[in-house]
């Protein structure tokens, strides 16, 4: 259930409900409703939650991790850290992306 996963992620980070509410700009009671299943966050809030907690939105919603085809991503230069705009080499971008994906899968 979404609320249970949300609470587990929050407590594993050592965050209180109040701290999460502060991060999101809502009341503690409003945040608490997410954890007990009385309310569901909108897409913008869900994205914020996933970023704060370091998990995917798929994990929060369904308990599953997004599936990545690592070889496809690593072999497509256009998808490799496009925001770097030539500041790093393609090989460095591949290494960075591999590290980030590996870290994400190890944490979950």
Curated annotation (Swiss-Prot):
Keywords: DNA-binding, Transcription, Transcription regulation. The keyword Transmembrane does not apply. It holds the Pfam family HTH_3. Residues 6-60 form the HTH cro/C1-type domain. CDD domains: HTH_XRE. It comes from the Bacteria. One of its GO terms (molecular function) is DNA binding. InterPro entries: Cro/C1-type_HTH, Lambda_DNA-bd_dom_sf. Residues 17-36 bind DNA. This is SPbeta prophage-derived uncharacterized HTH-type transcriptional regulator YonR. The gene is yonR.
């Amino acid at each position: 259930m979404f609320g249970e996963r949300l609470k587990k992620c929050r407590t594993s980070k050592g965050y209180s409900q109040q701290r999460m509410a502060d991060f999101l700009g809502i009341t503690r009671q409003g945040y608490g409703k997410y954890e007990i299943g009385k309310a569901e966050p909108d897409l913008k809030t869900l994205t914020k939650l996933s970023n704060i907690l370091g998990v995917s939105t798929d994990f929060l919603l369904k308990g599953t991790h997004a599936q990545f085809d690592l070889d496809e991503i690593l072999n497509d230069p256009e998808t490799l850290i496009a925001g770097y705009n030539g500041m790093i080499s393609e090989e460095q971008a591949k290494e960075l992306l591999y590290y980030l994906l590996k870290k994400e899968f190890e944490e979950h």
